[in-house]
From Swiss-Prot:
Entries under CDD domains matching the protein: GDPD_like_SMaseD_PLD
Record's keyword annotation contains Transferase: no
GO biological process: killing of cells of another organism; lipid catabolic process
Catalytic residue list: H5, H41
Predominant location category: secreted
Covalent S-S links between cysteines: C45-C51, C47-C190
UniProt cross-references to Gene3D superfamilies, sorted A to Z: Phosphatidylinositol (PI) phosphodiesterase (3.20.20.190)
Highest taxon of source: Eukaryota
Organism this protein belongs to: Sicarius peruensis (Six-eyed sand spider)
Keyword Lyase attached: yes
Name of protein: Dermonecrotic toxin SpeSicTox-betaIIA2i
A cellular component annotation (GO) from this entry: extracellular region
Binding-site residues, Mg(2+): E25, D27, D85
């Protein structure tokens, strides 16, 4: 999975897909009551990027629905995963439950269309800190109450704050979640980051019977040397400001027979097992 990073304006969606991304990450900004308002990162953000691009959240969902609905004139078959970077750290943890209800409801109304020809992409809920775990409970509760639990099959969970992996597992156990789990490891592209935690996450993913990590990705990679380093370790995905650079690296002899771009036929919730 090549994840285009900080794709917050509607016009950037096709721009990043044209560069080779098959997944996009966008920031979801909330008001003080936990209502998702905009796709917006704000200042500071990654080096060399404009931090202020934004869209109204529901309008953004309407657009990506079209891009991921077969038969729609805007359909792009390569876009298979949407990662929502939920800016819950900007609001009180007490509002995490309200935020979960709001995001689930807006996805039902504007993306899935409650079963009426909605978008088909997989959804990854990127949660910054384990203390905001009530967001997940609220999201699942809302799908159940609205009679649309079938969409759980399309939704995964990912804690992105580089917290202790065992603490993350404990929170997932508390929630009763042991599938559809990704694990991110990374830092803003402005700073270097070692591989110690990334290696631990990959080790857990590859431990037979370990349920709490099915995919691991590294973010936000801009240098080809760091992309190569991550691929050598065996990541499932790379988040980058430059998807075309990742495409180029994947074509190199060292990687071209080991990796390929994920398509809609690839299940993002299953561990990859080499043949």
């Amino acid at each position: 999975w090549i994840m285009g990073h900080m794709v917050n304006a509607i016009e950037q969606v096709d721009e990043f897909l044209d560069l080779g991304a098959n997944a996009i990450e966008f920031d979801v900004d909330f008001d003080d009551d936990g209502v998702a308002k905009y796709t917006h990162h704000g200042i500071p953000c990654d080096c060399g990027r404009l931090c202020t691009k934004y869209a109204v959240f529901t309008e953004y969902l309407d657009y990506v629905r079209q891009v991921t609905t077969p038969g729609d004139p805007k359909f792009r078959k390569e876009l298979v995963l949407l990662a929502l970077d939920l800016k819950l750290q900007r609001i009180s943890s007490e509002k995490a439950y309200a935020a979960g209800v709001d995001v689930a409801t807006k996805l039902l109304d504007h993306y899935w269309m409650r079963g009426w020809n909605g978008g088909r992409a997989y959804i990854l809920l990127n949660i910054p800190l384990v203390e905001d775990y009530e967001f997940i409970r609220a999201f699942k509760d809302t799908l159940r109450k609205e009679g649309h639990e079938q969409y759980n099959a399309k939704v995964g969970i990912n804690f992105t704050g580089n917290e202790d992996l065992d603490e993350i597992r404990e929170v997932l156990e508390k929630l009763g979640e042991d599938e559809h789990i990704w694990q991110a490891d990374g830092i803003t592209s402005c700073f270097p980051r070692g591989t110690e935690r990334l290696k631990k996450a990959l080790e857990k993913r590859d431990t037979p019977g370990y349920k709490y990590i099915s995919k691991v990705y590294a973010w936000t990679l801009v240098r080809s040397s760091i992309m190569r380093r991550s691929l050598r370790l065996g990541v499932d995905g790379v988040m980058s400001n430059y998807p075309d650079s990742v495409v180029k690296v994947l074509k190199e002899k060292e990687f071209s027979d080991k990796f390929r771009l994920a398509t809609y036929a690839d299940n993002p919730w299953e561990k990859f097992t080499p043949i």
